[in-house]
């Protein structure tokens, strides 16, 4: 493994909403053109070894926006990993000589008519070397199944260890993990990655109003600082829906944050396709972890104390073990409102 610094490139694409799996080809064509320029320009100082595609780059957010039937989306829009789409991305990995981190709504062979939100990593040979199944989809609008929604069967298939929920790929360019989009709104997911060895975390995409409020940047920087790891957070530029409306629902603020919480590369604007770059210095990260007496916080976790916070369940496990994910209004009524009441009943909220 080389510890020489290298460049990471995050694409900031314009996304076209899909209505069928075949429509992904339109986004792939755009992404490839953007990647060619981004890798060429991004590598002028140091070689590009990591290429990052934001969540939604392949399929858009059709299910969230249109409150689609889950099983129908699984059959018509979700992909298989590996499959033709990841094969295409794999050809780019070989073309550019890079690792690629990306995302797709994808099926799982053990869960018919269901799809998960999957972050994945391709190595420079084009092989899929990591799949991360999103643990905390965006409530109440995202219909992706979480491993927690089918927890009993998931643990039968994958076990209960960190690799079942926060897998990390140990690669020549560092240990790569995924906490996409809303997952990073929960510090526990970043900590799960860090405790499984993650050094470089994929965190993208995030919508308005959470970007304009500052939440996106606060979370990115805090997760990096708390866990002494890089956070890669390119945000999409614009979105064209099936009705033809082109709009920026994301608000820019694409960034790559280093292991001490400083944004190294940043593009503030949205609206037009571009890219963000930064230097990844693994040697500096590992030195910080190995020599700091204070700010390598993870070494000081008093885990016996924190375990007491999790003895009582909060969000219900196995919510979709026997049914498809709920539509927006039903989710609000059957999940969101009871969860708020639970916090009050326990005396946590007033």
Describe the residue ranges of each PLM region:
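Active-site-proximal beta-strand elements of phosphoester/diester hydrolases
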Residues: 3-20, 24, 52, 175-183, ...
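Short catalytic helix/loop segments, enriched in acidic residues and glycine
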Residues: 25-38
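Cys-nucleophile CN-hydrolase/nitrilase-fold catalytic domain and related Cys-dependent amidase chemistry
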Residues: 36-133, 140, 207-222, 226-227
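Short beta-strand scaffold segments in enzyme catalytic cores
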Residues: 102-103, 117-121, 167-169, 254-256, ...
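Active-site catalytic loop in hydrolytic enzyme cores
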Residues: 108-199, 208-222
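C-terminal beta-strand edge segments of enzyme domains
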Residues: 235-350
């Amino acid at each position: 493994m080389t510890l020489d610094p290298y460049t990471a490139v995050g694409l900031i694409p314009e996304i076209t909403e899909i209505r069928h799996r075949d429509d992904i080809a339109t986004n792939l064509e755009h992404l490839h053109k953007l990647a060619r320029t981004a890798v060429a320009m991004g590598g002028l100082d140091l070689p590009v070894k990591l290429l990052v595609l934001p969540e939604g780059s392949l399929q858009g957010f059709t299910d969230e926006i249109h409150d689609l039937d889950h099983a129908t989306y699984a059959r018509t829009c979700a992909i298989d990993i590996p499959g033709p789409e990841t094969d295409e991305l794999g050809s780019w990995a070989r073309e550019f000589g890079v690792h690629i981190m990306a995302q797709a709504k994808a099926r799982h062979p053990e869960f018919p008519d269901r799809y998960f939100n999957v972050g994945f990593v391709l190595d420079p040979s084009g092989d899929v070397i990591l799949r991360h199944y999103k643990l905390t989809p965006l409530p109440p609008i995202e219909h992706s199944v979480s491993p927690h929604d089918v927890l009993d069967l998931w643990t039968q298939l994958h076990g209960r260890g960190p690799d079942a929920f926060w897998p990390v790929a140990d690669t020549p360019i560092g240990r790569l993990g995924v906490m996409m989009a809303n997952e990073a709104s929960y510090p526990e997911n970043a900590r799960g990655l860090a405790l499984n060895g993650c050094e470089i975390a994929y965190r993208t995409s995030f919508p308005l109003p959470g970007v304009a409020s500052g939440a996106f940047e606060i979370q990115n920087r805090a997760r990096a600082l708390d866990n002494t790891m890089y956070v890669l957070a390119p945000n999409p530029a614009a979105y064209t829906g099936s009705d033809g409306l082109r709009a920026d629902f994301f608000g820019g603020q694409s960034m790559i944050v280093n292991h001490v919480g400083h944004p190294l590369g940043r593009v503030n604007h949205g609206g037009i396709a571009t890219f963000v770059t930064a230097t990844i210095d693994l040697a500096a990260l590992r030195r910080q972890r190995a020599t700091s007496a204070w700010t390598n916080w993870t070494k000081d976790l008093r885990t016996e104390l924190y375990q007491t916070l999790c003895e009582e369940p909060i969000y219900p496990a196995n919510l979709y073990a026997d049914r498809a994910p709920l539509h927006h209004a039903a989710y609000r009524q059957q999940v969101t409102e009871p969860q708020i009441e639970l916090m009050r009943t326990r005396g946590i909220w007033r």
